Amino acid sequence: TDTADQTIDTRYLKRLIDLSGQVDAARERLVTGKHGLGRARYGIAVSGSRTAAWAASFPRNPFQVPVVVDMSGAAGQLAAGLVEGHLDETTEMVRLLRLARLEIDRPDGLDWKRDALKALHWEELEPEELELCPPLILLGSDEMLAARGLSQLVWLLNSRLPVKVLVLSSLEMGLVEASVNDARAGIGLLALAQRNAFVAQTSIGDAVHFGDSVMQALAFDGPALVQVYAPSPSRDGYAIDELVEQSVRAVAARTLPLFRYDPRAEGVFGSRISLDGNPQSDSLLVVNDDDVTYTPVDWAFAQGRFATHFKPLGQSAPSSVPVHEWFALDAAGRRGKTAFVAIEDG
């Protein structure tokens, strides 16, 4: 009778044993880790100033994920380096899994396919493989990210790195400080102009739009920027119980229009911008149920930081008109007229 070949390929068997051990170790790091919780779901890089120094002192901070605080003003470069490290680790894991599959399937050209894996780069990974890489969130104020770190931010938005930038906007608008061409005043539009990143402009006054924007930014496979209006009563000059009201008013007054831009959406650039969430989006200004019209001036008037830009309407003021009517006039119609904001006594 014929007898089957009982020869054992010891080198092949050793490769399988080694690969099995490496896969088990990788799974242990990913699923369990040192503390039984597995790998962190995301990381945070904070672009801070002296007021954020406390957050760098582990464990005396509220974060339950790896956090690094940059005090040098180079948070964009730091975030890029960190996420590239994440991507390298993910690529190494994918390389290991692909190699294990090759050794099991043993296709034609196994040797050169094995060698080709050594040059695998993260940009060659499949979308489902890239999902293994935890996102990195770059968090900072508009002053740190859009003013001092503007060049780094623009570079990030034009890279393919999966860095998610969360900009806490004060909506300073270049009015508090005598600045020229302040990038903070239009950081959302500036990011939009790059066309390559997911961009959202939102407010804590609209929790649904805010939450959806963050979720979509995290799901996007490239860079993303979410600008969120994060008011501060002590900084901006109003009572703390008006915080949410001010956030809602910023949207209603068109000071901060809500929008989202997804480069993956169908159509051309303009058709990929969604204005969903804005009240009365077909109208220039919002009119509430009490027939009160909101304007950016009404939003600014409610904040002490803009007080120097207002003064009582004098009797000698020429042709005074309510500010919402002034907005509806063309350039010729506005000539010689004084816009005013009406307030109730007391």
Residue ranges and their predicted role:
Residues 1, 39-42, 65-97, 232-346:
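Flexible, low-complexity linker and terminal segments
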